[in-house]
């Protein structure tokens, strides 16, 4: 509601896992139709939210999972929906952050990458796979539509309580020794029963989508849009600057 994105339908992915990948989208609302002799299907917007299980963890898993998701998304497009897609980035952003920090350790002339930059990278490479997977599926059906990924920032409140209680898990599972090493670095770590330990970071609530007008313009032009991956890159306003 805060973003005013004019969304009429919401789809959410189930917890099925890549190895049991069935229909990953749950229909919450259905389209309305006009009445009388002129009854017609009114084009409506839908949001498809892909959780981390619908994307896999490794690059090969992601490519397989994206092909499956693309089929269901293409079905919606064939039915006349305008489609916006958002996605999780929990495993991916953690792997990127670890890789960038390990590189900085090996090459001291480079500084570690902040989480915001890693989030932007994850939007890019997940969007790349989704964009090409959906485009390919549409072309296989003889549908010629543009699929675009929008690098998306969200403005957050610097005083959000979430900054004091990190809850968003990221990266791979760790053993107890690795978890202790992370804690020594000042990072927050939680234990998931029977699975191991994972790092957690803050997940403040979005106040406003910075690129909202661009997303709406693309949807108005009947393009398929991938946006706000990982919930968006959290930024704070400071005068005319975002940081």
Residue ranges and their predicted role:
Residues 54-56, 90-94, 156-159, 233-235:
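Short, active-site-adjacent cap segments at secondary-structure transitions
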Residues 42-86, 95-105, 217-221:
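N-terminal glycine-/serine-/threonine-rich phosphate-binding loop
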Residues 2-14:
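Extreme N-terminal basic, low-complexity initiation segments
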Residues 54-56, 224-243:
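Conserved mixed alpha/beta catalytic, RNA-binding, or beta-rich assembly cores of soluble enzyme
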Residues 10, 21-23, 41:
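Short hydrophobic targeting helices and cationic amphipathic motifs
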Residues 103-225:
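Ligand-binding beta-strand-loop-alpha-helix segment within the catalytic cores
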């Amino acid at each position: 509601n805060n973003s005013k994105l004019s969304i009429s339908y919401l789809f959410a992915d189930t917890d099925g896992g890549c190895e049991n990948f069935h229909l990953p989208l749950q229909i919450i609302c259905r389209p309305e139709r006009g009445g009388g002799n002129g009854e017609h299907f009114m084009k409506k917007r839908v949001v498809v939210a892909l959780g981390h299980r619908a994307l896999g963890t490794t690059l090969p898993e992601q490519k397989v999972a994206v092909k499956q998701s693309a089929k269901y998304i293409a079905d919606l497009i064939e039915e006349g929906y305008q489609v916006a897609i958002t996605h999780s980035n929990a495993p991916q952003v953690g792997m990127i952050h670890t890789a960038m920090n390990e590189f900085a350790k090996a090459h001291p002339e480079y500084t570690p990458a902040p989480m915001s930059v890693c989030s932007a990278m994850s939007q890019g490479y997940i969007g790349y796979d989704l964009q090409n997977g959906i485009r390919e599926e549409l072309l296989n059906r003889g549908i010629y539509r543009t699929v675009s990924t929008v690098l998306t920032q969200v403005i957050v409140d610097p005083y959000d309580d979430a900054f004091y209680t990190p809850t968003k898990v990221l990266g791979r599972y760790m053993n107890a020794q690795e978890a202790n090493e992370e804690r020594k670095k000042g990072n927050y770590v939680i234990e998931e029963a029977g699975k191991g330990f994972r790092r957690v970071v803050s997940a403040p609530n979005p106040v406003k989508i910075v690129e909202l007008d661009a997303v709406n313009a693309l949807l108005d032009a009947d393009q398929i849009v991938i946006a706000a991956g990982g919930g968006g890159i959290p930024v704070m306003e400071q005068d005319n600057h975002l940081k």
